[in-house]
Each structure stands twice: as C-alpha cells, then as structure tokens.
Amino acid sequence: MSGPVRFAVVGSGWRSQFHIRMAKALPERLQVVAVVTLNAAEAERITSTWGVPAVTSIDEALAARPEFVVAAVSWPAMPGVVRQLVAAGVPVYAETPPAPELEGLRALWDEVGASGLVQVGEQYTLMPGHASRLELVRQGVVGRPNSVEIASTHLYHAVSLVRSFLDVDMDEVTVNARAFRAPLADPLTFDGWVPDPQPQPRTTTIATLDFGDGRLGLYDFVENQWWNPLLARRIVVRGSLGEIVDDTVTRLTDGAVVTSPIVYRRTGVDMNLEGNEVVHTSFDGRVVYRNPWTGTRLSEDDIAVASLLTAVGAWVRDEGPEPYPLAQGCQDHAIGLAIEESVRTGSDVRVAKEVWA
C-alpha cells in the first residue's frame, strides 16, 4: 500500500471516534481527511480534540477526495447516508447494522447492493483471540466444526462469529430464542463505574440457531455483558475431532486425546519494558496469529478496527478482497432480528433465502 489511505467519517459520536483514533495511531497507514458533524460547534469540537478537519455536510467531505467514507451514524440515519454516498460513487464502510429492520435491509440492498461499493464494519473475527481460534478451525485442528457457543456480544456481532466459525454463508436457519429476567449487579456501564451497585433485574437471552446438517449456534447474552466485569466471555467451537473452549484446545490426534493452550505473547509484563500489548499467539509451538500493529499499544478491539480499516483501504485500491460485503452484514442482522422476533413471539423463526443471498 503506497501512502496512507485517505478516508472521511460521517458522524462524530463515540463509535466515529474509534476510527479517528486509529488514524492517529497509524498515520503512515490511515488519514482522516474530513469528519461530518451536525453543526459548526460540533465541528469545532472535533477539530480541537482530534486535530482533523471537520465539516457539516457530506458534500464538503467528498470535496476532500476520500478513498472511502466511514458511515458511523444512528440506525435510522444509516440507510440514507449509505444511499447518498453510493449515489456519489464513493466506497462505503458502514457501521453495523446497515439498516434497522428487515424491510430496511431489503430496500437498501435493492438500491445499492448491485453497486458493490458497500462494506460493513464487522471486526470481531479480526480480534487476536477469535482470529487465532478461526485459524485453528480452518486448519482442521478440531475436524469439521459442528457447533459454536458465544457468550460475549450481542445479536449481529455474535451471529457473525457463529457463521464464521461454522463456515456458513447464506444458509437458511431456524431460530428459537427465549429471554429470562434475574437480579444481577452491574458495577460498570457505558457511563463508567457505578457507586455501590445493587442487583437489579437484567435480561438473559438464549437462542439456538439451527443451520441444518448438524450445524448449530448457541447464543447466550446478558444485558450489558459488554461492560459488566462480573460476567466472563465464553466461546466454544465443537468439531468432529474435538473442541476449542476459550483458549484451550482438546482434540483427538494419533489415537490419543491431547489438550493444548493457545498461548499469548504479551509484552509489558513484570520486568518487560517493551510496552503493554499482544505480540502474537502460538499453538503447539507455532505462531498462528501476529499483531500487525506492534508498537502501537492498541487494545484488542482497536487492533481489529485498525485491521478492518486497512483492509477496506486495500480493497478500494484493488490490492485486497472485500473485507465484509454488505450481503454478509445484512445476513447477520436478519438473523439477529429473528432472535428478537422469536423472543417476542415465543415461536421458532425461519430465516429463508433473502434478496442479498
């Protein structure tokens, strides 16, 4: 890749600033040429805080000649922003989800799907842990993957992980979901630490995703699970020859049952002065994942976001494949919506072949 990829951002909220921060961390690879805000006061705040140009219209942002545009706006606003950018012939990186509801997904696909200009900001498979597990699954370490249990993130993000580990594309799926309420303390939320947190009713949603041919996803999400430090993240990938449970791999090999860990090399521990970050992961003495951004001290989620941004940059320059096409993002959200519908109705919901399949 020659020179930093130039991109603009539509939106100035919390998620928008993830992308601005990545450009600041990787100036040799990424450059923000404009941020579109709601008004002049917000534009001034963004420029003052981040040192990047800020404008109040998409047309002004496009005048800066970005190679692609990140759409990081509210759910209701997303389809309109995507349509406007595609109409201008500009590649789009749309934050999740690309439209709020199923009819909106279908309408958006009908209008922009054929353009091939839209990628979706689904980064979870690029996080070091998930990328390591996915590499082992692709290498056949646990045989044919048959089931995936995810207890860490919600709806379309979790669905993306399930589909990736099971290697299912646009397969039809039957969803059965239920919700349960129980008291749980919530010491940390989006707004920060809570003084003297007391147990309050919180919802747990459990869903099965039946893709047929023995392939199963098990979705387990507790309200505010992203932030609550009382709740562990769990992933189980079960295959025909063994299973991966978080960072432990048990499988049948050479007629024996063998258990091996996924090992993280982390610097900045004890007397190590290299800085605190993941360098690589290894399995049975061989490296299976390397952090492409060593030296930046990025968090694991930031590593994934930076990797996705640069992958979109490679794609727009015809130097790499589509990172996460619109059709995949639509499918993830359609299945996530089916989980919510099954909870509401108490019945199975079938996700059949859609217009983007």
Segments from the language model and where they lie:
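C-terminal helix-rich "cap/oligomerization" subdomain common to oxidoreductases
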Residues: M1-P4, E60, F68-V70, L117, ...
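N-terminal Rossmann-like dinucleotide-binding module
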Residues: M1-W50
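Short acidic low-complexity segments
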Residues: P53-A64
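Beta-strand-loop-alpha-helix segment that lines the small-molecule cofactor/substrate pocket
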Residues: E67-F68, S74-W75, P79-T125
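Basic phosphate/pyrophosphate-binding loop/patch that engages nucleotide-derived ligands
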Residues: D110-L117, E135-R144, R163-D169
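Rossmann-like NAD(P)H-binding beta-loop-alpha module
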Residues: P128-S147, A158
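Rossmann-like dinucleotide-binding domain that binds NAD(P)(H)
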Residues: R144-A232, V236, A327
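C-terminal glycine/acidic-rich active-site capping loop/insertion
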Residues: F211, I235-V236, L241-P323, A357
